Amino acid sequence: GADDRLACVRAALSRRTPVSIGAIGGSITAGSNYAVRSGATHLYHHKLLAALDAIHPVRNGHSLSNGGVPGTGPTYMEHCVHDHMPRRADLLLVEYAVNTDRNPASFERLLRTLLLLPHAPALVVVNAHRWRAVRPQDGRTDKCWNSKWPVDMAANATQRAAQSWGSAGQRDEINSDEDAIADLCRHYNVPLVSMRGALLGAVRSGALSIPAFMRDCKHPAGEGHTYLAQLLLHRLLSPPALTQAPPARGHPHKCR
């Protein structure tokens, strides 16, 4: 994705200027299946905030607004996003890979709304991942897994091998929402960080156990949120080498 808006955030950090962060998404961002846990420090955006406060400290700290809404997707947020984010955020984090409502057009409309905000905040799409669970009786994909699921996700090699990018030329029901989001980010030149992209190889090889960083098939544990925060921090503070990507679509952008 384009780096021009993130470059403005880096410039503000280097000047010791306070940065305002907004995060929108579903239960992963909210921190709960039923309520927003705005003080939950294990969430990826809180960990990003803590890292920025440590690396680029400012008086009173940088600010964060948790606009996550449990159990909702972009079908809701595209209509109400202005009620769930700071008035003038410098950086917006958008997390919907596991609950896009099978309606990527809603995500696209939300993305366009954010790209056209007059103050042109930097956007980063945060793709968590729904990990596959294979039913032992017939090898078909199960709806989800959790701590009571009858197969040991940490030790069962069949479960590790079932994790994939999806079949070429065939829409994968587990990955289709996530793939649609990635396609939209490429089209609009919006930066994206991906749990699947970072961890799939280690999971398939057995070097990393899914339950070591996930609470169930969709919701990260604290370690999973740490991985997402690390991906965000790297993308924010380490611009791509020799990037030639055109600016993200939206208003012409100059750092304020």
Residue ranges of predicted features:
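Serine-esterase "nucleophile elbow" of acetyl-processing enzymes
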Residues: 1-67, 79-93
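Extracellular serine-dependent O-acyl
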Residues: 1-5, 124-126, 171-211, 227-240
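Histidine-centered active-site loop/cap adjacent to the catalytic His
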Residues: 22, 208-255
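Cell-envelope and extracellular/periplasmic
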Residues: 27-28, 32-36, 63-82, 87-105, ...
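Catalytic cores of nucleotide-enabled group-transfer and carboxylate-activating enzymes in metabolic
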Residues: 44, 48-51, 98, 113-114, ...
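Generic structural signal for well-ordered alpha-helices
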Residues: 107-114, 178
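Helix C-cap/helix->beta junction micro-motif
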Residues: 117-119, 188
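Substrate-gating cap/lid alpha-helix
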Residues: 135-196
